[in-house]
Amino acid sequence: MLNWAPTLNFRYRFNKRSNLRINYRGTTTQPGMSDLLSIVDDSDPLNIKVGNPGLKPAFTNRLRLFYNTYIQSHQRSIMTYLNYSNTRNSISNKVTYDEITGGRTTQPENINGNWDVNAAVMFNTSVDSAGVWNINTFTTGGYNHYVSFLSLDKKSDSQKNVTRSMNIGERLSGSYRNSWLEFELDGSLNYTHSRNALQASSDMDTWQFSYGTNINLTLPWGTSVSTDLHENSRRGYSDESLNTNELIWNAQVSHSLL
């Protein structure tokens, strides 16, 4: 049994406030011992479990790229990253249906095609020279390609199924800050698109969005007040009870005795 786990870490500093990092890591996942044993478990004749001595270890590659910089003269910061991973020889349970006995036989098998990628960009800048007014934006996106064996019902063999999902998100905020007041307006939007090759009923196109404000007050004699008010909404779910609007208000008062 060999566990192969290569690692690479690279960092380059362009200057004191800008740097690039690249990280790679490979990991090996061994099959479970019970999956490798050439044993037939027929204690339940209608649900037979069979091992697979020919299973290969799964191997996952993970790559991360990260960059950030800060421009002091404009009080501006930029950050971005990209993550990618794929897995060879993933393990999924395959089911075979016996029409004569009505029983099902389950056996683990290797399957390929699993990978995902996600990325983000953050931009924060001061609008004025004093750094009192600020704007921040954070954009994210991702894609997932998931492959497995799937039985549509109890009387059918497993088939290779592919689920493709994509998500995009954005958060935008503007803020004002001085010695005693912090005030922010923000809004966010997230969209998820998912398609299932064998189960169209599992397809999704959903939206989640939120908007509101955050306020922090620093009062005399060690007293501070903070509050936030946000409207959170969801749309696109087949279950109407999940398509909701929620208004959430939080408030806090604190006092320091020191």
How would you describe each model-predicted region?
Residues 1-258:
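Exposed, low-structure sequence patches enriched in small/polar residues
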